Every structure is written in structure tokens, then in C-alpha cells.
Amino acid sequence: CALKDELGRVSIRQVRNVVGLQGRLFTALAHSNIVVDDIVQTEQGAATMIAFTVEHEDLGDAKQIVARTLTELGEGEMSVEVGLAKVSVVGVGMKSHAGVASRMFRALGDAGIGIHNITTSEIKISCIIDHAEGQRALETVHSAFGLGLGNGATIAMQIDSSRV
């Protein structure tokens, strides 16, 4: 399990999903050496919504780049959230074990920790949460999987040996 805190999220709404939009936006961010994390895109009718997280220290520059991109497009609106964190469960054993996501989500919900965003891959499940809940979320997820904090064992081995 891992915790990454001091994150901000930039959301772009009411932009037409034109070919190349994502490349244009994220190339501009990359040229400014802004590391982007947890990208989510959804379509809402003819418009699209793109949201992504960045380290808090990069938030000001990211906002300027997004504002400039929206001005060039002549459409869209931006919103910014601060005070976020990301808690993740990581391990290659997850792709062969059903129920890892449900265990994580249930544990966070039972602890009263709200989830703002979820991203997954074959080896990772990440939840964006309020920064203030970060440490408690990490401890909650560790407990849900029967892990000790800082015990040095890999989550893949621990998931393999636990019942999901």
C-alpha cells in the first residue's frame, strides 16, 4: 500500500472532444516538467471532461497551462481542487484475485472515508481522497488486507496469501 499526499486536481469541462485535444494539453504540461497523475476522461454528450492530479507545488503552473489551452480553444471551463491525497494498493497478485477492489472500497467506506476518484491497472488500484484522511486511509487499507505498516513485505505476496 502507498500514500501520496499534497495533491491538487485540475478539471476541464465543457470542451468538445476534438482529435488531438489530450495530446495538446498533456504535451504542454510535459514541456513545463509537470508530472501528471491519475488522468480521468469522461464524455458528457458532445462535450468531454478531463481531470488530472498533480503535486501541489505544480498546481499553479498547471492552472496557467490549462487556462491558456482553454483560451486557445475558445471554450471550456476549469475547476481546481486542493487538499487531496492518493492511497493505492499495488501488486502483481491483484490481476489474478477477484475482490481486491471491493475489499479496498468497502474498508474505506466503512471508515467513512470518501473516494473522489478511482483509477486502476493490472497491478494497482488508486483512490483520490481528502488529504486530511490520508494517513487514516492508509492504515485502513493496510488493516483490510492484514498488513502491518512498514513491515517491508510486498503487497503482491500478501494479497496472494490472503483471502479476498
Task: Cite the ranges covered by each PLM segment.
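A conserved regulatory-domain signal marking ACT and ACT-like small-molecule sensing domains
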Residues: C1-V164
